[in-house]
Design a protein with these regions (language model features):
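Short acidic-hydrophobic, aromatic-tinged amphipathic segments that line or gate anion-handling sites
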Residues: 235-239, 279
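Thiol/disulfide oxidoreductase modules built on the thioredoxin-like
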Residues: 243-290
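Active-site-proximal beta-strand/loop segments in catalytic clefts of secreted hydrolases
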Residues: 178-180, 211-214, 238-240
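Short, small/polar residue-rich loop motifs at catalytic or cofactor-binding pockets
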Residues: 150, 172, 261-263
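Structural microenvironment flanking redox-active thiols in thiol-disulfide oxidoreductases
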Residues: 188-228, 243-251
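Short active-site neighborhood of thiol/selenol oxidoreductases, capturing the structured segment around
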Residues: 164-193, 207-209
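Oxidative protein folding and maturation machinery
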Residues: 1-159
Length: 299
């Protein structure tokens, strides 16, 4: 059985359907038969030289990178492996590590799915206390900022002490940039973001919001804004009092809600403040904005 499981399906010749070649048929055949003779609850698979590489090949070439497609595959494999004492925790851990910090934007939805449907229902027992804490905290940091969700509320103040609320700023697009004025990478990236804003994004209705994540760095923040000539942005921060009020009330702070673990952290929102994109390069953000701004609007 294990020897049979090693074999990779051989793609058939391209068939002719209704007088036309069906070029996807060989691909579908290989995908549909990729796991023939494999029992996912068989712990012996872990002691073979082929299983992990075959698993990686399958997800790389035969599963769409779209999160919902990944979830269906992961869900099926874990269901089939559930009774395996070794392979089930192996697969759950492998998928967790892969999608906790995914290669492609939006795939962290798979990790959130795993947390909500496996870990939150008792499967944290397979983790040691440190890993359990890491997985739980990471899940809660990602739940609020999934693509398509309304962005978490941001109630801040600007450099003059005037209130700034994300949901009171009408705009076709909003880019929220969380940064540290003393961060070397921020000093490089924010002027580049501003260049794209001036050259392209302002014309399609973009509002830029720069959020200083360190309330104690007032002088450095104001100096940064002036030196980098970011005069067309809205600049704001959360006061120490507001931060303490969140802590006292047991509310998640915006750093957790926006998963800010590095700077700059950038989000692109639509007119309803739903998350369109996050954690991309400036060029990737620009590609998305150009595509979306050229689409006809629906009434």
């Amino acid at each position: 059985m294990l020897f049979s499981a090693m074999k990779r399906p051989v793609a058939p010749a391209v068939p002719i359907v209704n007088g036309k070649p069906d070029s996807l048929a060989p691909y579908r055949f290989v995908k549909n038969h990729f796991w023939d003779d494999v029992l996912f609850n068989d712990d012996r698979l872990l002691r073979t030289p082929f299983f992990e590489s075959k698993l990686d090949e399958y997800f790389k070439y035969y599963v769409s990178a779209e999160p919902d497609s990944l979830i269906e595959e992961v869900k099926y494999m874990l269901l089939m492996a559930k009774t395996g004492k070794e392979i089930y925790p192996y697969l759950l851990t492998k998928f967790t590590n892969k999608y906790m910090a995914p290669e492609f934007m939006g795939q962290d939805k798979v990790f959130v799915y795993l947390f909500e449907n496996f870990y939150a229902k008792g499967d944290t027992v397979i983790l040691n206390p440190a890993s359990r804490k890491t997985v739980t905290e990471r899940a809660y940091s990602l739940m609020a900022n999934q693509l398509g969700l309304p962005a978490p509320a941001l109630d801040l103040v600007d450099s003059l002490g005037k209130a700034v609320s994300l949901y009171n700023l009408p705009a076709t697009y909003t880019m929220v940039v969380f940064y540290d004025p003393n961060c070397g990478h921020c000093k490089e990236e924010l002027p580049r973001l501003d260049s794209f804003y001036r050259a392209k994004w302002k014309a399609v209705g973009m509002t830029m919001i720069g959020v200083n994540i360190y309330d104690a760095e007032q002088a450095a923040w104001k100096k940064f804004v002036v030196e980098k000539n970011l005069k067309n942005w809205i600049h704001a921060y959360q006061t120490k009092a507001a931060k303490e009020a969140d802590e006292k009330a047991g509310r998640a702070n915006y750093r957790q809600l926006y998963d800010i673990y590095k700077t700059p952290t950038v989000y692109l929102l639509d007119k309803d403040k739903r998350i369109i994109a996050k954690q991309l390069t400036i060029e990737q953000f620009d590609d998305i904005i150009q595509v979306k701004s050229k689409k006809p609007t629906t009434q």
